[in-house]
Amino acid sequence: LVAGGANIWFRNDQFHFAWRKLTDDFIMQARAEFIGEGVDPHRKAGLMIRQGLDADAPYVDAVVHGDGLTSLQFRRTRGGLTEQIESEVKGADVIQLERRGKRYIFSAARFGAPYSSVEIADIALGDEVHAGLFLSSHNPDVIEQVAFRNVRIIRPAKPGFVPYRDYIGSQLELLDVATGQRHIVHRSSYPFEAPNWTPDGTALIFNTSGADPQRRGRLYRFDLASRQATLIDTGFAIRNNNDHVLSFNGTMLGISDQSTDQGQSTIFTLPARGGVPKRITPLTPSYLHSWSPDGKFLLYTGGRNGEFDIYKIPSDGSGPEVRLTTAPGVDDGPEFTPDGKHIYFNSVRSGKMQIWRMGPNGENQERVTHDDFNNWFPHASPDGKWLAMISYGDDIDPSDHPYYRHVYLRLMPITADGSRANARVVAYVYGGQGSINVPSWSPDGTMIAFVSNTDDL
């Protein structure tokens, strides 16, 4: 945006506003960066929700100032004075403004760090509002510029929605892990989940979910050049869940399907382009998460006698399954590193869901993350140097990974000796279950594919 304007303060606002009309609850997100040094330290940019376009209209905004001040500003009534709640974050460049009825929640961060939030309640702007991006130079004789990136407007799940019965739409996104830049390459009001990147880099494989028995549980190959999705022939296996994985060489596809065994998840393999599934796991439920780099074994989570643990089995089904973990509570998301020397997984054995690792036969189990998040589904980069994960806050049961939450995609270096390393946020996402359940790195290690969620606006 390019703008002048005296200020957004007191009883009279002057600014450039790129808006659209919205109703009900919604979330806005963006990365904001001022262009140039600027003239006035109080130049302002951010996200705004406004009752109308009059200069003295009631509003709420999430604002970043030129001097680094970050705050939630609001005017309660027409012609009233602007009030402010300061954020503890200085110089934020990631901002989010969420409306829940008459509550407005402002979350801010410096890219790489988690959000810090402040909120205000009982601000009555009416159901239909003007919402969007703004800039004011704080000087009517000066023109300033701001760049907004990763702009999202999200319609969250409705209050009281029932998981696995009620669904909202999906967006397939590609994340540049070096810059944090995100690109939406596919949208659908019907939900889909869990992209796998093909080793040749040309396509992604995902599954449909949702409540429609004629549409859910199918696997599709999404061509990145044409942006078209093609149904994969999986024979009788038409109730696939989100635990599907390509072999390292890309020739075979492992699936977790619920068409047999009274709806229990069973692992099958078939050619990557489609074919007749071959059953691999004799026991259920079994949820696939990884092939070994040499293609000889499959890693999966198995529910046996009320316990969910990590197992491996020959990928041709020629031998029995081998249990690799025995700790009480959920162990899930096992994945081989590209060199085959380690298996990373998530476990609740410490009280929170954390990332662990072990040897290829279950030996030397050690904790990798030591933080206050609930971390799920570790994915090693193709060069074995980085570990991606999805991180929930404290608003969930640590043994669960629910749909439709505020989550982070985080990245941490893999250390050879397992010593502690810090994870940084690379994406601020509304998603959760189905976002990155399975390996989704690009073959060159520069990007991660994931699914975010929004209902129709």
PLM regions with names:
Residues 1-161:
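Extracellular glycan-recognition regions
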Residues 158-457:
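Sequence signature of WD/YWTD-type beta-propeller architectures
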